């Protein structure tokens, strides 16, 4: 049988609100393992709270394909016109510097990504493989026809990375640290799989926090009150202040996702002396067939207690994963310290196209060297695997 070619109408939208939420989320639901960050509610909250908008250097250019026959959304991607490289977690500052030194503008650039979110997941939502290929090709054509230096697709799935590779884009790899729930019944069950020294260190860290009189509340869904959001937002801002930088997100954003996607949120609040002193926010997704993934996202403290960061942002979340039957905990960007706590290295992907031929060649050679370095780095990390080999 000859397959009829479907005609699609391309849309370039300046706000997520221009896409019907139900149609967008229907594409998300088709994913084998959808992430909450691609949900319409999350992307719209970034826009409504003015975190990812023109004024912050994130001009939405959401790209959609609509089936001309049915009028239904067939594919969509979160795309932004960027005037800087903040909030991306795939670092191209050196590329931008090289452009500037040679008098060539690097910005604006096109970015297909979830703002401020280094989480691997589908970037081209689609009803089927044909629509996915067509939208991927549309992204590249848009970059080629626009006055931009480049197109970058951050943290796509491995399958998508291969698709972009087949279109001539350059692939880049990175490393994150993920924890796998090997059917643990409780936290001690997990500790029992670690080498003795690692196990001892974790117990010592937890004891320090306990002995300091710190207790914890784990809140999900509607149990998170506005006072909790206000305190968490204060902690979040403090983390950025401690690093002499400006926060990307704000209280309005956190309140908004608290209202629109409460079933995906876990807020941990640490308390001492009857008052809150630290907090961590995680996002999680239950899989239809059981299990699911928890994403550690933000943490902050207004008082210092030794090892409080590890307890609040790791051990409390690990316990939640075990109790809730979630099978993966993605710890986010960077952090070799996670290795000693049971998180193993995982390779992430990005895809890049540069319009300037000479720069494209130079970056291609750089990425070859960098990929070799990444592979050697992962091998080295695996040599320091914290789990028992055969016996303690």
What is each of the regions a protein language model found here?
Residues 1-392:
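N-acyltransferase acceptor-side catalytic subdomain
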């Amino acid at each position: 049988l000859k397959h009829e070619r479907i005609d699609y109408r391309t849309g370039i939208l300046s706000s997520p609100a221009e896409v019907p939420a139900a149609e967008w989320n229907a594409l998300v639901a088709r994913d084998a393992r959808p992430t909450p960050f691609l949900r319409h509610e999350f992307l719209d909250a970034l826009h409504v709270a003015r975190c990812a908008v023109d004024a912050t250097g994130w001009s939405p250019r959401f790209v959609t394909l609509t089936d001309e026959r049915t009028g239904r959304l067939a594919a969509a991607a979160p795309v932004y016109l960027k005037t800087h490289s903040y909030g991306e977690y795939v670092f191209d500052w050196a590329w931008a510097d090289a452009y500037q030194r040679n008098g060539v503008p690097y910005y604006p650039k096109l970015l297909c990504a979830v703002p401020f979110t280094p989480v691997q997941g589908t970037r081209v939502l689609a009803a089927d493989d044909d629509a996915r290929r067509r939208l991927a090709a549309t992204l590249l054509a848009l970059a080629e026809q626009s006055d931009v230096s480049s197109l970058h697709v951050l943290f796509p799935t491995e399958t998508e990375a291969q698709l972009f590779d087949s279109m001539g884009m350059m692939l880049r790899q990175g490393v994150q640290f993920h924890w796998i729930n090997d059917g643990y019944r409780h936290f001690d069950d997990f500790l029992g799989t670690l080498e003795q020294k690692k196990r001892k260190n974790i117990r010592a860290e937890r004891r320090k926090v306990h002995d300091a009189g710190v207790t914890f509340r784990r809140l999900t869904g509607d149990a998170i009150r506005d006072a909790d959001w206000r305190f968490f937002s204060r902690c979040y801002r403090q983390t950025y202040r401690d690093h002499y930088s400006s926060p990307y997100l704000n209280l309005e954003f956190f309140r908004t996702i608290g209202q629109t996607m409460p079933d995906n949120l876990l807020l941990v609040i640490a308390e001492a002396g009857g008052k809150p002193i630290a907090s961590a926010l995680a996002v999680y997704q239950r899989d239809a067939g059981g299990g699911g993934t928890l994403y550690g996202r933000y943490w902050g403290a207004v008082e210092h207690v030794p090892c409080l960061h590890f307890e609040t942002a790791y051990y409390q979340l690990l316990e939640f994963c075990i109790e809730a039957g979630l099978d993966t905990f993605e710890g986010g960007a960077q952090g070799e310290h996670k290795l000693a706590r049971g998180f193993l290295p995982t390779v992430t992907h990005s895809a890049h196209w540069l319009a300037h031929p000479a720069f494209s060649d130079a970056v291609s050679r750089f990425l070859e060297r960098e990929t070799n370095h990444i592979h050697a780095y992962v091998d080295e990390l695996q040599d320091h695997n914290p789990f028992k080999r055969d016996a303690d």
